[in-house]
């Protein structure tokens, strides 16, 4: 994946207020789907849609934890370190480099 495509994917994932709230919610600790949905004040289904987009962009990573005592699996989500610097000069350089 080119740098310009990677940047576009991250910016797209960050382009929704609910996804920004999810990022703020899991900033300090990983959480499972219900915790995130409850903290953000949205349904599980909507949280899952937004988390999927964040995970696809590499901003969020998930892992499955199986609680043996309860015999159920929970998917935990955690924020991945990221830092985005954008300027017209950087964009021009990356577009020229990628040939797009």
Indicate where each model-derived feature is located.
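Short capping segments at the starts of secondary-structure elements
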Residues: 17, 28-32
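A short acidic, leucine-rich amphipathic alpha-helix
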Residues: 22, 35-39, 54
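Beta-hairpin "wing" of winged helix-turn-helix
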Residues: 56-71
